[in-house]
Design a protein with these regions (language model features):
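Glycosyltransferase donor-sugar binding loop
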Residues: 41-43, 215-219, 243-257
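Membrane-proximal helix-turn-helix segments that form the acceptor-binding/catalytic region
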Residues: 121-153, 174
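Conserved donor-binding/catalytic core segment of Leloir-type glycosyltransferases
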Residues: 151, 205-222, 228-231
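A short helix/loop element that forms part of the nucleotide-sugar donor recognition site in Leloir-type
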Residues: 185-204
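Aromatic "clamp/platform" in nucleotide-sugar-dependent glycosyltransferases that forms part
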Residues: 274, 293
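Short hydrophobic beta-strand element within catalytic cores of glycosyltransferases
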Residues: 310-313
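Conserved acidic donor-binding segment of nucleotide-sugar-dependent glycosyltransferases
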Residues: 325-326, 330-337, 345-351
């Protein structure tokens, strides 16, 4: 049986998509016969989780401190494969769940509408010592003298490493992101969610609304400003449009509530706050929208496809590679409000929306976005690396 060390900074699933993805990855690796163990800097130890820096006083462990602890652990414990989501050149595989640090910095800055502020953000990113340390470690890992394979979650991520670091293509394996498709909410869960919305919110005054779900914890980066502006265009073009934007996430909504009111669409944008069961929200809405400025391969969009929901996102989202524009939903080159409005208008048409749903089912996108498929491809990469080691 192959043994694998999975390196991650923290283990708490509540922290976000990367931690949840690793938890699902661990479960599926073990299901497929890999003896996997998480090596974390911080978190809660468990049977298959070793926490190596629990004696450190700070919440965020310095990369160099974690590296020293890892090398000490690996000297005493053998693993066939060392698979890291952090940029350590001693790893066999580097799987950057957030894409490349350089691209993340650039696109985060690009998400600011004020050009001066965007330029300021490009400069000040380098004042973040941890982020800068990770960027330099990533650059070092990509040097021609190193051998670590980058397991990219999308072709979008692959192109980042080629463009920013001139990394050779033979050191990149594109293994599209995957999710646990068996945790999707049931139709009944979705109906309960929808009924609650239609009964307890402004939706009760509108017959047959078409609900577009936006879900994120960083509203600016994920394009909520653009989504609201696109709703203004939709309502200006079609005052009787059935479109509603349903916003889920833990970010502060204040500025976006003000924006919606200033643009005259406050009755068309509903803010729900953080959702304990996002699957029910996906199941209860008609489509999903994420006009993001940056996402290596969004779990939210994959979960929507697994639930047979049409999706709208941008080329800055690696998940856009998992479906076809105009067939399963719509792909916008960048967060353009006019194009977003066109996509919303199109999916307000029942026939168009149903055609997308049927195409998603027919093309079996649910299996395509599964963690089972993802781990199967990852296992193949493990086998290749082990063969080369024996070589």
């Amino acid at each position: 049986m192959i043994s694998a060390a999975i390196i991650i900074e923290r283990t708490e699933i509540r922290l976000g998509g990367a931690e949840r993805s690793i938890a699902e990855l661990m479960d599926e690796l073990q299901t497929q016969g890999i003896r996997a163990r998480i090596l974390a800097a911080a978190g809660t130890p468990a049977e298959n989780i070793a926490v190596l820096c629990s004696n450190q006083p700070t919440h965020r462990i310095q990369l160099s401190v974690f590296e020293k602890a890892l090398l000490s652990h690996l000297a005493d414990n053998h693993y066939d494969i060392v698979h890291s989501v952090l940029p350590f050149a001693f790893a066999d595989i580097y799987q950057p769940r957030g894409g490349s640090y350089k691209e993340a910095m650039l696109q985060n800055a690009a998400s600011y509408t004020n050009p001066a502020l965007a330029q300021w953000k490009r400069w000040t990113h380098f004042f973040n010592r941890r982020r800068t340390a990770c960027l330099y470690a990533e650059q070092a890992l990509c040097r021609p003298t190193e051998h670590t394979i980058v397991a990219a979650l999308s072709d979008y991520v692959k192109q980042q490493f080629i463009r920013h670091y001139q990394l050779s293509e033979n050191r990149i394996a594109v293994i599209p992101n995957g999710i646990n498709i068996h945790r999707s909410a049931t139709h009944e869960n979705g109906e309960t969610f929808r009924q609650s919305l239609c009964t307890n919110t402004a939706l009760k005054d509108y017959p047959n609304p078409v609900l577009f779900l936006f879900a994120a914890n960083n509203f600016r980066l994920k394009g909520l400003r653009e989504a609201i502006s696109s709703m203004q265009i939709v309502i200006r073009q079609h005052p009787e449009s059935p479109a509603f934007l349903i916003v889920a996430g833990s970010d502060d909504p204040t500025r976006y509530q003000i924006q919606a009111k200033m643009q005259g669409v406050e009755k068309r944008v509903l803010f729900l706050g953080a959702q304990g069961n996002l699957g029910s929200a996906i199941a209860g809405c008609d489509a999903t929208i994420l006009p993001t400025w940056y996402d290596p391969c969004s779990r939210f969009i994959l979960e929507a496809l697994a639930a047979n929901k049409p999706v709208i996102t941008t080329r800055f989202n690696g998940a856009s590679e998992q479906y076809q524009d105009g067939k399963h939903g719509f792909i916008i080159k960048r967060p353009c409000t006019v194009r977003l409005a066109d996509a919303i208008n199109a999916l307000c048409d029942t026939a168009t929306r149903q055609s997308c749903v049927e195409a998603i089912r027919h093309d079996n996108l649910k299996e395509q976005v599964s963690i089972t498929r993802h781990v199967g491809q990852l296992r193949h990469l493990y086998d290749i690396i082990l063969t080369q080691k024996k070589g």
